[in-house]
């Protein structure tokens, strides 16, 4: 937490483009005080990997099962090359009904790699909802 590794290393290492100093300052702003960085330590530990932690893995699994049968409109923003949602997971998402898919350039924090394309896609998708 002392080094603010999530903001200083994980974030810039997970984008295709180099964030500007102004952008980095915005990410740093809420975490200037080391004690305020606790969420950046806790949250990654809650990401389910190989079924652990089980409570979170169960929630994710139940939600994925629901999305696979729900007719609720969905917008799938596929990132190329992507980072986490690739391979089998990407293919699974593509099977969901009533879904629009777009492709943008991006790795993990895709809003930083393709902000305008994502904003335009979300706006158009929302306008086309019936």
Regions found by a protein language model. Name each.
Residues 32, 68, 127-130:
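Residue-level signal for alpha-helix termini/capping positions
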Residues 1-47, 54:
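Helix-rich cap/lid subdomain of alpha/beta-hydrolase
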Residues 18, 36-94, 101:
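Conserved serine/cysteine hydrolase catalytic core
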Residues 29, 79, 104-106:
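Active-site donor-binding loop signature of nucleotide-sugar glycosyltransferases
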Residues 97-130:
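Catalytic active-site module of serine/aspartate enzymes centered on a nucleophile-bearing elbow/loop
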Residues 9, 26, 42, 62, ...:
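Alpha-helical elements of Rossmann-like donor-binding domains used by nucleotide-donor carbohydrate transfer enzymes
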């Amino acid at each position: 937490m002392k080094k603010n590794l999530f903001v200083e290393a994980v974030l810039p290492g997970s984008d295709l483009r180099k964030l500007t100093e102004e952008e980095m300052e915005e990410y740093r702003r809420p975490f200037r005080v080391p004690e305020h960085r606790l969420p950046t330590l806790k949250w990654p530990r809650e990401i389910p990997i190989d079924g652990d932690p089980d409570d979170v893995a169960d929630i994710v699994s139940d939600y994925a099962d629901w999305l696979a049968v729900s007719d609720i409109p969905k917008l799938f923003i596929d990132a190329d090359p992507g980072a986490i949602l690739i391979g089998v997971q990407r293919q699974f998402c593509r099977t969901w009904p009533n879904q629009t898919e777009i492709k943008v350039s991006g790795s993990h924090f895709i809003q930083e790699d393709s902000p305008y394309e994502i904003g335009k896609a979300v706006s158009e998708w929302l306008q086309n909802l019936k």
